[in-house]
Amino acid sequence: SSLHCGDDPWCPTGCCENEDCDIGCKRDWEKSRSQP
């Protein structure tokens, strides 16, 4: 089951590192993290 942290659709880093976090958020976070 997907989850978001609190009411913010953008999970904080600690949540996005958690495989239980929302997959869309995790994908966006990883994409932003790979940018210079």
Curated annotation (Swiss-Prot):
- Stretches assigned to coiled coil: none
Q: Name one GO molecular function term.
A: toxin activity
Summed up, the tissue specificity of this protein is:
Expressed by the venom duct.
| Protein name according to UniProt | Augerpeptide hhe6.4
What's noted about domains in the record? The presence of a 'disulfide through disulfide knot' structurally defines this protein as a knottin. The cysteine framework is VI/VII (C-C-CC-C-C).
Q: Which UniProt keywords apply?
A: Disulfide bond, Knottin, Secreted, Toxin
Q: List the disulfide bonds.
A: 5-16, 11-21, 15-25
Query: Where would you find this protein in the cell?
Result: Secreted
